[in-house]
Swiss-Prot record:
The lineage of its organism: Eukaryota, Metazoa, Chordata, Craniata, Vertebrata. ATP binds at I51, G52, R53, G54, Q55, F56, S57, E58, V59, K74. The record marks Y108 as: Autoinhibitory. Displays an autoinhibited conformation: Tyr-108 side chain points into the active site, interacts with the activation loop, and blocks the alphaC helix. The autoinhibitory conformation is released upon binding with NEK9. GO terms for molecular function: ATP binding; DNA-binding transcription factor binding; kinesin binding; magnesium ion binding; protein kinase binding; protein serine kinase activity; protein serine/threonine kinase activity; transcription corepressor binding. Keywords: Apoptosis, ATP-binding, Cell cycle, Cell division, Chromosome partition, Cytoplasm, Cytoskeleton, Kinase, Magnesium, Metal-binding, Mitosis, Nucleotide-binding, Nucleus, Phosphoprotein, Serine/threonine-protein kinase, Transferase. It is an enzyme of class 2 (transferase). This is Serine/threonine-protein kinase Nek6. Protein kinase which plays an important role in mitotic cell cycle progression. Required for chromosome segregation at metaphase-anaphase transition, robust mitotic spindle formation and cytokinesis. Phosphorylates ATF4, CIR1, PTN, RAD26L, RBBP6, RPS7, RPS6KB1, TRIP4, STAT3 and histones H1 and H3. Phosphorylates KIF11 to promote mitotic spindle formation. Involved in G2/M phase cell cycle arrest induced by DNA damage. Inhibition of activity results in apoptosis. May contribute to tumorigenesis by suppressing p53/TP53-induced cancer cell senescence. Belongs to the protein kinase superfamily. NEK Ser/Thr protein kinase family. NIMA subfamily. Its cofactor is Mg(2+). Binding to NEK9 stimulates its activity by releasing the autoinhibitory function of Tyr-108.
Length: 313
């Protein structure tokens, strides 16, 4: 969804978006495990235009007819093809995502199932993303100043720390999912739900796009954990400095990419342009053993210190 408007604040309540009165006795969620919301339906939205397309979903700019708020409406197209447990877990996870409330995270406002299709309502505002900024600097043949790197990275760390403190992993941190407003505010979006899709459903899509941010534990199918988000943060910090992924290579196949990732084989960042602290943090995050990577509290602390230091020099 690079180059598309992001799902970001455009007014509206941080609580459920649709405020139509519920029944006198709301349905018991235990008896309806797939029921996310009983208050919204597609009839409550006027869809204006498509603003993005993901691997498994489409995103539309829409207006909620109940309060006239402009939102992003994400329709998960393959929800009906997911197995029953994946559906239930996905619904549960979205419930957790709706509880996140942080200035650097795109807010999940509401969600509902209609015609066997999952619909997610998100905050929206027009903005660019980090991948666009990286492409711009690359085209200009200029490096991103270190103070700018820390200005955005510290906000991203704040968002991830909020998620991790609530035991929620992002699972898909990459430049295209880091949106930047016109006033320089970072908004982390597209919180990863892809793991809920069944292997049969996703098999044909698993190699769509080169997974440059894939961690060694994912290559070995050892499962995703909080330290996998740290690996992705390290890759993103590196890419902001080098203007390309640490494991990028021309004409590289998936096997050679996996080899480079397992060996942490990437070109060093230029010492004459970036501080030792930045280069050190990258190497700590892009580390093969997840248990040896720092936690988000440490990464955020370093980012705060460096943001203050580079802003004052």
């Amino acid at each position: 969804m690079a180059g598309q408007p992001s799902h970001m604040p455009h007014g509206g309540s941080p609580n459920n978006l649709c405020h139509t009165p519920g029944p006198a006795h709301p349905p018991d969620p235990q008896r309806h495990p797939n029921a996310l919301s009983f208050r919204c339906s597609l009839a409550d939205f006027q869809i204006e235009k498509k603003i993005g397309r993901g691997q498994f979903s489409e995103v539309y700019k829409a207006t909620c007819l109940l309060d006239r708020k402009t939102v992003a409406l994400k329709k998960v197209q393959i929800f009906e093809m997911m197995d029953a447990k994946a559906r239930q877990d996905c619904v549960k996870e979205i419930g957790l995502l709706k509880q996140l409330n942080h200035p650097n995270i795109i807010k999940y406002l509401d969600s509902f199932i209609e015609d066997n299709e999952l619909n997610i309502v998100l905050e929206l505002a027009d903005a660019g993303d980090l991948s666009q900024m990286i492409k711009y600097f690359k085209k200009q043949k200029r490096l991103i100043p270190e103070r700018t790197v820390w200005k955005y990275f510290v906000q991203l760390c704040s968002a991830v720390e909020h998620m991790h403190s609530r035991r929620v992993m992002h699972r898909d941190i990459k430049p295209a999912n880091v949106f930047i407003t016109a006033t320089g505010i970072v908004k982390l979006g597209d919180l990863g739900l892809g793991r809920f899709f069944s292997s049969e459903t996703t098999a044909a899509h698993s190699l769509v796009g080169t997974p440059y941010y894939m961690s060694p534990e994912r290559i070995h199918e050892n499962g995703y954990n909080f330290k996998s988000d740290i690996w992705s943060l390290g890759c993103l910090l590196y890419e902001m400095a080098a203007l390309q992924s640490p494991f990028y290579g021309d004409k590289m196949n998936l096997f050679s990419l996996c080899q480079k990732i397992e060996q942490c084989d990437y070109p060093p960042l230029p010492g004459e342009h970036y501080s030792e602290k930045l280069r050190e943090l990258v190497s700590m995050c892009i580390y093969p053993d997840p248990n040896q990577r720092p936690d988000i509290g440490y990464v955020h602390q370093v980012a705060r210190q460096m943001h203050v230091w580079t802003s004052s020099t």
